[in-house]
């Protein structure tokens, strides 16, 4: 290990233990590399899960036994929506509208406006795939317990389609001991910026306040 400490802690990193298509290396490899280059702590934030937690925890115990002063930060990069109830409601409305249009077209009902089937499929797919990224970090034991509960709930049928999701209500329920950060370009702040940038800086600021 280098004797020079680096005044930087990475709070957003993926491992092949939980983000196989978006990572290089297992948690222990990340931790060793960080320590050997002067790092004193590192967060692991895999996509939608904490599958790397046991790797991270056990390797930390090994490092500790070897006299290496290093702090693992447990976390996740969650898939976030403001309201899962509204998301589900929008999906159900689009799905029912598409079914109704198809039924009216088949029955030859006069005056029926038939939507393009491909456009309907795109609309449904767009809603179903909707999510933002949000980095959540464990602050203490209470936070770790709450993080496990939050992630477990995100995989419930009503919250899951291709991706496990959390919303404001769930975050409020399990907020104690958890720190939230804005993640990446897929995060809510960056998303609001790109969606409103052509409207000017005030529109961007207002969207971010919301």
What does each model-found stretch correspond to?
Residues 1-210:
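Phosphodiester-processing cores and adjacent nucleic acid-binding clamps
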